[in-house]
């Protein structure tokens, strides 16, 4: 089978394939799942507040924020951004707390990106 000796030229205690001194095998890492943060429409939150949320928490330009806000208004929901799970969860929490603090019913949620 393989040569299980340490490569004398390496500081790493990894076994090398037969006869290939210095070759280190790197495990393939899976790409992390990404999650969409979605803003949900309601009948009370003003459009300018939704734009403010998109600019403040998602670093959107005025034009980008307005486009997403119109999706929320017309389609019932709009994607604010796509993030790793931890970042998406934090964004959802920030948006929901900010809306509640300002006494608006705006809600956000996350959904795994397909």
UniProtKB/Swiss-Prot annotation:
It comes from the Bacteria. InterPro entries: ClpS (IPR022935), ClpS_core (IPR003769), Ribosomal_bL12_C/ClpS-like (IPR014719). One of its GO terms (biological process) is protein catabolic process. It holds the Pfam family ClpS. Binds to the N-terminal domain of the chaperone ClpA. Belongs to the ClpS family. HAMAP family: ClpS. NCBIfam families: PRK00033.1-5. Involved in the modulation of the specificity of the ClpAP-mediated ATP-dependent protein degradation. This is ATP-dependent Clp protease adapter protein ClpS. The gene is clpS.
